[in-house]
């Protein structure tokens, strides 16, 4: 079995071994549904799969600030939240990674093991335009929490920022 095929199996197996989301694995970026256009990668064959965490955990945690998606690309898992990018949503976006980190640690350790260690793992992708003016305190809060919104999740741009 080739390395590429094995890596895809590892992410799929991690999802299937996680009781909360065991039926949620999707090939490619299918989990993103209407937001597929927000995901850009240089080599689509390196997409190991995706997971809609929000939908698959909604009944289990209806009142929690659930995270939207997990994407495994090139054997690393990234977490992407497609959400309104307005000042009133910044506080919600601060809570969401906290929920995700706790959920990964307690309920999804196999997925957590695949989380990228070499890059920022959490990304806020704006669902439409961004309206968080730089002079507003919410902008500073988003910067401090390393969760500024972006138009799209573009792996090539992320690589450039990390270098």
Residue ranges and their predicted role:
Residues 1-61:
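Acidic-basic catalytic patches of nuclease active cores, encompassing PD-(D/E)XK
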Residues 4-12, 112-163:
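Domain-level recognition of nuclease-like catalytic cores that cleave nucleotide substrates
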Residues 60-61, 85-89, 129-133:
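Short acidic, S/G/P-rich loop/turn micro-motifs used as interaction or catalytic elements
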Residues 62-66:
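Short, flexible loop/turn motifs enriched in small residues
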Residues 69-71, 75-86:
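Conserved catalytic cores of phosphodiester-cleaving nucleases, focusing on short active-site segments
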Residues 86-103:
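Mg2+/Mn2+-dependent nuclease catalytic core
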Residues 102-116:
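Arginine/glycine-rich "motif VI" loop of SF2 helicases in the C-terminal RecA-like domain
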């Amino acid at each position: 079995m080739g390395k590429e095929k094995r890596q895809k199996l590892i992410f799929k197996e991690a999802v299937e071994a996680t009781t909360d989301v065991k039926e949620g694995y999707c090939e490619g970026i299918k989990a993103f549904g209407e937001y597929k256009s927000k995901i850009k990668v240089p080599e689509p064959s390196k997409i190991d799969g995706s997971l809609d965490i929000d939908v698959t955990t909604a009944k289990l945690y209806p009142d929690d600030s659930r995270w939207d998606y997990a994407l495994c690309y090139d054997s690393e898992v990234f977490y992407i939240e497609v959400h309104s990018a307005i000042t009133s949503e910044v506080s919600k976006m601060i809570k969401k990674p906290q929920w995700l980190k706790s959920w990964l640690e307690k309920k999804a350790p196999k997925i957590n093991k695949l989380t990228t260690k070499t890059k920022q793992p959490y990304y806020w992708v704006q669902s439409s335009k961004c309206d968080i003016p730089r002079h507003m305190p919410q902008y500073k809060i988003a910067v401090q929490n390393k969760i500024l919104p972006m138009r799209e999740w573009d792996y090539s741009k992320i690589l450039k920022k990390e270098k």
